[in-house]
């Protein structure tokens, strides 16, 4: 560990600067150069990267019980470290007893360091805690290198206190990348540690 007060740095960082997330550093040092070599990119701007992660929790039952949305917002805030936006119904649907403006879900969009820290926790801690987990499907890309998958319960995240769960809630997680093809997106996410099944 290098500590100097003259140059005002600690371990090569300016004093007061936040440490670079572990996965972001790995992407810069190892993953990006490996992808450049694998796909023979001429320009560094062609190397695919992660733009944002969107975590969405639908609460259809909130139409009948408004308190349920509070639990979803609390869980999502604990998992992501960011205050979720409450999503409301855009139109009324009588069959679902849904009126326009009713809260039906919560959503968080993560960018920057929070995004990298969330992805790191997701692949190293949360996904391995899923019961009978055999890997993620490699086919759920959208054709443009973005990946969406579902998680059936929030308890896989260690930020959630199992004793305080009022009900099991699933969520959809979308990883938006700058990749132009599914193969590029798959290679990027696999390098980041996403455990894809071998089909």
Swiss-Prot record:
The keyword Repeat does not apply. GO terms for molecular function: rRNA binding; structural constituent of ribosome; tRNA binding. GO terms for biological process: translation. It holds the Pfam family Ribosomal_L5. HAMAP family: Ribosomal_uL5_B (MF_01333_B). Part of the 50S ribosomal subunit; part of the 5S rRNA/L5/L18/L25 subcomplex. Contacts the 5S rRNA and the P site tRNA. Forms a bridge to the 30S subunit in the 70S ribosome. This is one of the proteins that bind and probably mediate the attachment of the 5S RNA into the large ribosomal subunit, where it forms part of the central protuberance. In the 70S ribosome it contacts protein S13 of the 30S subunit (bridge B1b), connecting the 2 subunits; this bridge is implicated in subunit movement. Contacts the P site tRNA; the 5S rRNA and some of its associated proteins might help stabilize positioning of ribosome-bound tRNAs. This is Large ribosomal subunit protein uL5. The gene is rplE.
């Amino acid at each position: 560990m290098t500590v100097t007060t003259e140059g005002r740095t600690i371990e090569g960082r300016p004093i007061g600067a936040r440490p670079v997330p572990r996965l972001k550093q790995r992407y810069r040092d190892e993953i990006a150069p490996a992808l450049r070599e694998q796909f023979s990119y001429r320009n560094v701007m062609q190397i695919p990267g992660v733009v944002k992660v969107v975590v969405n929790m639908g609460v259809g039952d909130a139409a009948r019980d408004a308190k349920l949305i509070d639990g979803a917002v609390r869980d999502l805030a604990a998992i992501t470290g960011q205050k979720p936006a409450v999503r409301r119904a855009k139109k009324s649907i009588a069959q679902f007893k849904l009126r326009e403006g009713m809260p039906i879900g919560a959503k968080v969009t993560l960018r920057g360091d929070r995004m990298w820290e969330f992805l790191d926790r997701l692949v190293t801690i949360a996904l391995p805690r899923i019961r009978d987990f055999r890997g993620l499907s490699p086919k759920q890309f959208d054709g443009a290198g973005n990946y969406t998958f579902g998680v059936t319960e929030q308890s896989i995240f260690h930020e959630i206190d199992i004793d305080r769960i009022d009900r099991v809630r699933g969520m959809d997680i979308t990883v938006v990348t700058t990749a132009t093809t599914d193969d590029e997106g798959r290679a990027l996410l696999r390098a980041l540690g996403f455990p894809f099944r071998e089909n």
